[in-house]
Curated annotation (Swiss-Prot):
InterPro entries: Enolpyruvate_Tfrase_dom (IPR001986), Enolpyruvate_Tfrase_sf (IPR036968), EPSP_synthase (IPR006264), EPSP_synthase_CS (IPR023193), RNA3'P_cycl/enolpyr_Trfase_a/b (IPR013792). The gene is aroA. It comes from Helicobacter pylori (strain ATCC 700392 / 26695). PANTHER family: AROM/DEHYDROQUINATE SYNTHASE (PTHR21090), PENTAFUNCTIONAL AROM POLYPEPTIDE (PTHR21090:SF5). One of its GO terms (cellular component) is cytoplasm. This is 3-phosphoshikimate 1-carboxyvinyltransferase.
Amino acid sequence: MIELDINASDKSLSHRAVIFSLLAQKPCFVRNFLMGEDCLSSLEIAQNLGAKVENTAKNSFKITPPTTIKEPNKILNCNNSGTTMRLYSGLLSAQKGLFVLSGDNSLNARPMKRIIEPLKAFGAKILGREDNHFAPLVILGSPLKACHYESPIASAQVKSAFILSALQAQGASTYKESELSRNHTEIMLKSLGADIHNQDGVLKISPLEKPLEAFDFTIANDPSSAFFFALACAITPKSRLLLKNVLLNPTRIEAFEVLKKMGASIEYAIQSKDLEMIGDIYVEHAPLKAINIDQNIASLIDEIPALSIAMLFAKGKSMVKNAKDLRAKESDRIKAVVSNFKALGIECEEFEDGFYVEGLEDISPLKQRFSRIKPPLIKSFNDHRIAMSFAVLTLALPLEIDNLECANISFPQFKHLLNQFKKGSLNGN
């Protein structure tokens, strides 16, 4: 059995720990922070807003929040991180000062009206480019009034931005989403003293009566990162894998459940349950069968590109529907998956809210073909999840990816661990 402690701290928790520290009044400690480019953007902005950040150990920090958030004298650069931009928008909407949030070309092309509209419901003064559709965003912090909002999309980033504004508004606010998205924001903030309740799918958020409690968080491993290696195991004959110290929040393991339905053997062993469930995941290769994915999309949307690789190895036609938001990620992930598959000669087709893939079941003829002719270069579209998904496919096919370095955005250790997995599977471990 291959045993991996993937050493990829959870991206969602890392972002939130930094951003939430700014609503505390005492030093906070974040351990096992994800040192990927996205999370470092959140950390740098915290410093630009007046927080003092000190290294305490490897990948660990003491964050001393400012007494009041400082108005920066420069643009707050979110780089490629949508989480950074959207959550800081909620936080800063009620803070005194003028704040400008911008990012790289990819982030500035991603939809921002989805957060501007709920924040404006509070009375927030926030503007975006092209009639509020895109960043850069300009925020003039101002007093907020409670509101009641029903989101047309299930998005943890939209929900989190709303909650951060609601905590600073006058009066209790409510938020309803179309389906449950990841709930780390609610869990973490409640543990720090925020009054947040979920009743029949409606969140009620009361304003903070005092600063958040200081905290000492140790970040568990990211299930979205771990999933790439569950996929690697599922498509590699005779392989068995133990993934250690993984966050097992039910809103984060839907992709593992889908892979399990496809035929892979997957079991969980909970090791601790404090703030969040943490444990180990056992994965064993088994023949895969096709699947249709059209529910619980919000809980697995980040893993759909990786699941598309599993579909390639499955018997039958697999389908993804109700996943239009894939087109609004770091790349148009529907087009990215389908265009790469078509370049490889795979039968597939895209539609507005998804795609289908005709599984090969036996991939050896394609492997033989690419031993005779040079395979096409896989296009990452500078999207970390597209790059890593197709990198897993290189375990079975002799492919090259145009920019695997973009994995550093969320998973700096990915290439090293993929090589470890490859050596382990070749050695029969």
